[in-house]
């Protein structure tokens, strides 16, 4: 991503033929990179490079690519979901509007969308699901998906069932995942634990970041602890904070006011609890 944004002309020149070529993974990756570049202000450059070919069909193909509905921006080939994907026996996502559960057909589509690459941006269809369904039911569904993946032997090619926790997870997800992250290095699963740190960061809530910071503060597996420290530093930088400032914001306030006091109200009697 950094290289593409630094050298957009070279990148577009190299990517264009693949983006307009044979359907497949190479085309999907090239188109995703071009979309990222256009979203970062390089659409005029893309159109200029297309015109250099002096071929109307190239210009037309690029214009068609730019006009593509965001919901159509998904891999050309959608593989069959794995055998462990059995959503009919899991917690079902519930609609906010009427508390109805999603039907099997919608759960099939949800599984397919969770498989789509999410590196550059979340697929718009998933944003629609998050807007339509309750956060807690989505988190429970995704946890069931994750545990099914673990029970199936955690196949690496289906790791989307793990990283989906970062897409649809919540505070409870972070609390349940953290003990596993802490234990995995001792089970020769350092790489999985590292992905777990990424998931906590992706959830991004104060509770999730508190869990991440707890790993950064204390863990017997030092390589993972250092990686957690790096994640906290990156998050602090993205928020224009120092690490100390971020940690201060993540510290639980225990219900205290700015003076470090808590008012206990028992009707006719009140007590103030203060901490030095």
Predicted segments with their positions:
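C-terminal structured domains
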Residues: 188-195, 223, 227-230, 236-276
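Alpha-helix N-cap/helix-start positions at coil->helix boundaries
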Residues: 9, 24-28, 154-155, 171, ...
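Cytosolic small-GTPase signaling regions in large eukaryotic proteins
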Residues: 3-5, 20-21, 28-73, 230-232, ...
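Long hydrophobic alpha-helices with heptad-repeat/coiled-coil character
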Residues: 3, 21-33, 209, 227, ...
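Amphipathic alpha-helical scaffolding segments comprising HEAT/armadillo-like alpha-solenoid repeats
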Residues: 1, 8-19, 40-50, 136-149, ...
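Extended repeat-based scaffolds of very large eukaryotic assembly and lipid-transport proteins
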Residues: 46-186, 256-257, 261-276
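Structural detector for internal amphipathic alpha-helices that build alpha-solenoid repeat scaffolds
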Residues: 1-6, 28-37, 126-132, 158-169, ...
